From Swiss-Prot:
This is UPF0690 protein C1orf52 homolog. The modification Phosphotyrosine is found at residue 130. Residues 1-66, 96-180 are annotated as: Disordered. Belongs to the UPF0690 family. The keyword Phosphoprotein applies. Disulfide bonds: none annotated. GO terms for cellular component: nucleoplasm. PANTHER family: UPF0690 PROTEIN C1ORF52 (PTHR31833:SF2). It comes from Mus musculus (Mouse). The modification Phosphoserine is found at residue 156. It holds the Pfam family DUF4660.
């Protein structure tokens, strides 16, 4: 049983051996193929093939420790500061005011205070309530002009859309009939 147990690192020992020879065979012929591959460099027939093969992982890591461009012979340490590449500095951006019709910022914004509407003259208001439009009643400048007696406005059916009004003479007898 101990002879059948494999060394876990034996897989890497046969680095570079062709897998086509041992694809259908069991583990014992693979070991035999590995031994042949290990002794092949000494024989003259397989010497050319050994030169073309890459070195095994152990040999490779023994020979290469650091890349030459990282090595600083004075300090014998990697000089990382020499290899740092800094991004170019961007100039500070200047603040430009956008031209728009938006509301200005709060510092410069002041609300325009509208004056209160003019107060209604109470004499005119009470005069209108009690229909006391005598000679001594105050006159409102905004009030419409009254028609002289004997005239009234009449709207015709044809001109309802235009709201045009016509003035006609009313006889004193007709005015009394319409009021009743």
């Amino acid at each position: 049983m101990a002879a059948e147990e494999k060394d876990p690192l034996s897989y890497f020992a046969a680095y570079g051996s062709s897998s086509s020879d041992s694809s259908d065979e069991n583990s014992e012929p693979e070991d035999a193929g590995r031994k042949e591959a290990a002794s092949a460099p000494t024989t003259g027939g397989r010497g050319k093939q050994a030169e073309k093969r890459l070195p095994g992982p152990d040999e490779l890591f023994r020979s290469v420790t650091r890349p030459a461009f990282l090595y600083n012979p004075l300090n014998k340490q990697i000089d990382w500061e020499r290899h740092v590449v800094k991004a170019p500095e961007e100039p500070p951006k200047e603040f430009k005011i956008w031209k728009s019709n938006c509301v200005p910022p709060p510092e410069t914004y002041t609300t325009e205070k509208k004056p209160p509407p003019p107060e209604l003259d109470m004499a005119i208001k009470w005069s209108n309530i009690y229909e006391d439009n005598g000679d001594d009643a105050p006159q409102n400048a905004k009030k419409a002009r009254l028609l002289p007696e004997g005239e009234e406005t009449v709207e015709s059916d044809d001109d309802k859309d235009e709201r045009a009004s016509k003035i006609r003479r009313v006889e004193p007898g007709e005015a009394a009939k319409k009021k009743k």
